[in-house]
Amino acid sequence: MKSIVSVLTLLLLINAVAALRFVLPAKDKNELPFCVRDFVKNGELVVVTVESPKYADGQQLSVVVRDAHGNEYTRIKNVLGREITTFSSHQDTALDVCFHNVANSHQDLGKTKEIDLSVAIGANARDWEQIQASEKLKPAEVQLRKIEEIVDEVDKEMNYLKMREIRLRDTNESTNRRVKFFSVGITLALIALGVWQIIYLRSYFRSKHII
């Protein structure tokens, strides 16, 4: 029984919601944004929650969520309070949540804004309270349902890593074959060049009656 509980606890830890609290200084609008990266699979549900102080303090915080392929999921200007964005990923990719804290004036440069960010992916992104109410599930049934989805996600992740390893191995083997053929070609070319030089020098020396 203890081993089962340990496994379930491990699964919950692996699929924990990514939560961060950090302080972002106000900068010029031309400065590069600060980005937090996570990884999502194709069709996976994602809930991004950003929270910052509601009061105006000479800083304007904007948030952009996009993936490594350039797909933009949301763009929020002047975040005040809590902003929640829900979407499904278009493909297996890295997901960037980028923050740009711009000072309204030169005097506001150097001010800071405290930001809370949470990124829930897959089973953790679902509203389990709503599911429990709509399907009239018991708390234990909700936990089992959640664990079942997490196990399925872990299985998909393992299959993805396996396929990725196969692709990388095939690429490595293909590269090794090309390097080997290139090395053989260079060696044959050097041998041919050496033979040609010997023949040429022999012919030259004979024409000069040296040999």
Curated annotation (Swiss-Prot):
Its main location: endoplasmic reticulum. It is a single-pass type I membrane protein. The keyword Protein transport applies. Residues 202-211 are cytoplasmic. The chain crosses the membrane at residues 181-201. The keyword Protein transport applies. Keywords: Endoplasmic reticulum, ER-Golgi transport, Golgi apparatus, Membrane, Protein transport, Signal, Transmembrane, Transmembrane helix, Transport. GO terms for cellular component: COPII-coated ER to Golgi transport vesicle; endoplasmic reticulum; endoplasmic reticulum membrane; endoplasmic reticulum-Golgi intermediate compartment; Golgi apparatus; Golgi membrane. It comes from the Eukaryota. Residues 33-121 form the GOLD domain. It is found in: Endoplasmic reticulum membrane; Golgi apparatus membrane. InterPro entries: Emp24-like (IPR015720), GOLD_dom (IPR009038). Constituent of COPII-coated endoplasmic reticulum-derived transport vesicles. Required for efficient transport of a subset of secretory proteins to the Golgi. Facilitates retrograde transport from the Golgi to the endoplasmic reticulum. Belongs to the EMP24/GP25L family. This is Endoplasmic reticulum vesicle protein 25. The gene is ERV25.
